[in-house]
Amino acid sequence: TDKTIPEANVYFIGFCVHRGSCSMEVSDFLSDLSGKQIALFGTCGMGDSPEYYKDIAGRVSAWIEADNDYLGYFICQGKMPQKVRMKYESMRTDENNDQIDRFIQNFDLALTHPDDLDVEHAKVFVDHMLKKIQL
């Protein structure tokens, strides 16, 4: 990022999932941190899958250097740009019709996310992280 980020002991790093990970800006920022406590949170358009979210968190947390204290992660479903739905529709063939239907159904369900329940879960995550933080 071009912006100066204030020095802190604890960082809550947010990101939107893109192709199963975070942006290069986020990964660069994470890899530059040293001696910090770090919690990750993000949104993911590709459905509500705890297993997939765990995989994403593993890929993103891999950028955190070993001298940091990785506190944990929270990922919830997030909405996607309309161009994603249009791409799905343009990819449809007789062979992948059912798969594209599932992608579009997920896209439509994601339009309301993050929702109130996601926000409540995020609050629980933050409370849990605050208990882990060593100031």
Give, region by region, the residue ranges found by the protein language model.
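FMN-binding flavodoxin-like domain, especially the glycine-rich phosphate-binding loop
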Residues: 7-135
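A short, well-structured beta->alpha microelement
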Residues: 1-4
